[in-house]
Amino acid sequence: MPSNALWLRADQLSSVSPAVLDWLFDEGSLTRRLTALADGAFRVEPLLEGWQTLRDDECQGLDVPTGSSGWVREVYLHGHDRPWVFARSVAARSALEGSGFDLALLGTRSLGELLFSDSAFERGPIEVCRYPAAGLPAEVRAEGLWGRRSRFSRGALGVLVAEVYLPRLWDQAGIADV
């Protein structure tokens, strides 16, 4: 992602509606929340998976050296067959190797479901930003979309999960003041 992403904690925000804050800082499973909102009509659409050089802000979020290699997984989280969330999850190669955790095997399964079902994973603080449009797939690219990220840790393994809330989600949730 371009370096103009400014990740903020809840106490650093102002003028954000309570309804938006509720979605951004909900510490439960986003997969479960989306599934409920979609009355079960939820699915994961993988867009990209593979080894890449991690972005600078991702290296910082994972506490690994700038330019580190890692596994990158980008997906849409769909409700009613429409993309509601763009998610990008990354883990450093150095931490993944030998961890017994293989992101390549997820396919159309939700990473969030896996992370929340394994009590060994601990979730770090949630940070939010107005996600840079350049970091989004072309078909949903827009300025000013809210994104959030948090690190899930299990021993030496860290998985950084970023989720960008797309306009159709806010429409479905009945939230206008985004």
UniProtKB/Swiss-Prot annotation:
Localization, UniProt: Cytoplasm
InterPro entries, alphabetized: Chorismate--pyruvate_lyase (IPR007440), Chorismate_lyase_/UTRA_dom_sf (IPR028978)
Coiled-coil intervals, chain numbering: none
Reaction(s) the record says it catalyses: chorismate = 4-hydroxybenzoate + pyruvate
Keyword terms of this UniProt record: Cytoplasm, Lyase, Pyruvate, Ubiquinone biosynthesis
GO MF term set: chorismate lyase activity
Transmembrane intervals: none
Gene Ontology CC entries for this record: cytosol
Pathway: Cofactor biosynthesis; ubiquinone biosynthesis
Similarity comment: family membership: Belongs to the UbiC family.
This protein's name: Probable chorismate pyruvate-lyase
Species for this entry: Pseudomonas aeruginosa (strain ATCC 15692 / DSM 22644 / CIP 104116 / JCM 14847 / LMG 12228 / 1C / PRS 101 / PAO1)
